[in-house]
Amino acid sequence: MRKIAKYSVVLTVSLSLLAGCSSGSDSLESNEGSDSDTSPMTLTFFGADSNANWNKMQDDVGKEITKQTGITLDAEFAVSDPAQRLALIAASGDYPDLISPKGDLDKLVDAGAMLDLTDLIDQHAPNIKKLFGDQIKRLRYSNDDPSIYVIPTYSAIDGVNFVAGAGFELQHRAVKEAGYPQINTLQDYENVIRSYLEKHPTDENGNKNIGMTLNADDWHIQITVTNPAAETTGKSGDGEYYIDPNTNEATYHFRTEGEKEYFQWLNHMYNTGLLDQESFVQKNDQYLAKVASGRVIGLIDADWGYSDGEKALKASGKNDQTYGHYSVMLSDQYKDNRYQSTGFMAGWGVGITESAEDPVRAIKFLDFLASEEGQILNYWGLEGKQYTVEDGKRVVPADVQQRIINDNIAFTRESGVGLYTNIGGHYGDGVKDSTGNYYTKNFPEQIIENYTDAEKETLKAYDAATWMDLFPNEKDFPVKPWGAVWNISVPSDDEINIIANKVKDITWKQIPQAVMAKPEEFDAIWNDYQQKLIDAGVEKMEQGFTKYVQDRVKLWNE
């Protein structure tokens, strides 16, 4: 009742301001209408992702956002386990004005922390309405609760995959020395690492080179250790589950065909010295430091997971020690569907809490970020500084481009370009604005412009223009009707959450044990792992989650 009453008062006041006023025009400029207010205001914000480059909106983009909206964010970003911090926020009753909880939205909804944004969007957010169009139905929370609690910011609208930022990574120098061989299977990938280490066991300073390292620090274990078992066996990224495309039934992916063999390969890499012995004990900063040292030949990660380490290499001019992305599968019998289209996933995003003193100002702020002006500002920066317009086309000047490539951390902190992507709704790659320019810089010509000489040399050897050319095209696969199940929220009081935590703990313990075991011990550990999953109730969890997948399909497609 507290939430409803507070919202009603604010909405009534806002509607009274609108009385007798017209909308003015059909323009999508964000600061239109009689309730536009750009007086200085600070909104508190919590984000479940870390953000090392956050500069308190004192970057160029942030200052312009404040100029246009009057809003400054007093932001806190997660530095450790965001789930624990969000649980504390939910229990406290003291919420930030804006919150981006990622997969823990259910905790806040159950606590009554979140405002239903449906009427706010309808009355005050023309750009958000325009952006999502007929896909706005996907913003609904569930079949039972059609409220809109967040503006999706982690999933772009109408985009296509131009960027291959995942797969298996290899240093350019290693691939070059191997003669640019075909790299399609785990064996191909292993061969490049092995041959390079045999010739170069140490770096120029006598430090031992590392064949491959993994990041098993907390949730990173899913990205670099466990998810690849599904991806290399043709089960596109659905988090901890494999979804049968014919029945929409969920199976904990560790119980599916081929995954034992993947972890057996990791065990082989560990026991032959090609996998870093510290992979399962190092922290994230130690992982990044190894990448930055240039001694790690191979990675299995998303580019955002190791980019800070790679940026240090670029800043030092060591471009041949940075990484290319390869479509690697367990064997030739599998087809890589890592980039199978999810369609618009909705899901994770930014919401307004019941603690917000002025929800209208908050939604207008989010509406500006979703506007054409706001998106261009975030993606490109300031005209005349981070880009120019030549013959009607946005162009990044050469000196700016060099900073983006070789001094990216400092450039991002100063410019703010890209820092606000996960705070505002946005179009995806390949979508053009009203001037005929692409919203994002991720279109083929600009992607190529962003590549280092080492990347261009490697790609040329493979007769490819971009890394995506080395992967099967998303058009080869149907769009997944459930999107991606890792962004399906399960109510916090559902028993499957308890089971999911149990099987997660088992997996995070048993998989490293299996990888680090002696080869002759692997089968026994694997069999014990599978039995422990059953004992923990994994089958009940699968059945329960299947219902949520099928509900998602119904919610989105009927």
Description of each model-found segment:
Residues Q321-S331, R338-Y420:
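Polar, glycine-rich mid-to-C-terminal structural blocks
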Residues L377-K509, M516:
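Conserved small-residue motifs centered on glycine
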Residues K6-V10, C21-D188, H200, T233-Y242, ...:
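Conserved N-terminal structural module of periplasmic/extracytoplasmic solute-binding proteins
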Residues V79-Q84, Q282-D285, S331-Q333:
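Short acidic loop-to-helix transition motifs that present clustered carboxylates
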Residues T72-A78, E278, G324-S327:
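General small-molecule cofactor/ligand-binding pocket signal
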Residues S147, P152-Q222, D244-K290, R295, ...:
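Helix-loop-helix "hinge/cap" segment bordering the ligand-binding cleft or interdomain interface
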Residues L105-D106, G112-R140, I193-L197, N207-I243, ...:
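Carboxylate/His-rich catalytic cores and anion/metal-binding grooves
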Residues S16-G20:
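C-terminal motif of bacterial Sec signal peptides marking the signal peptidase cleavage site
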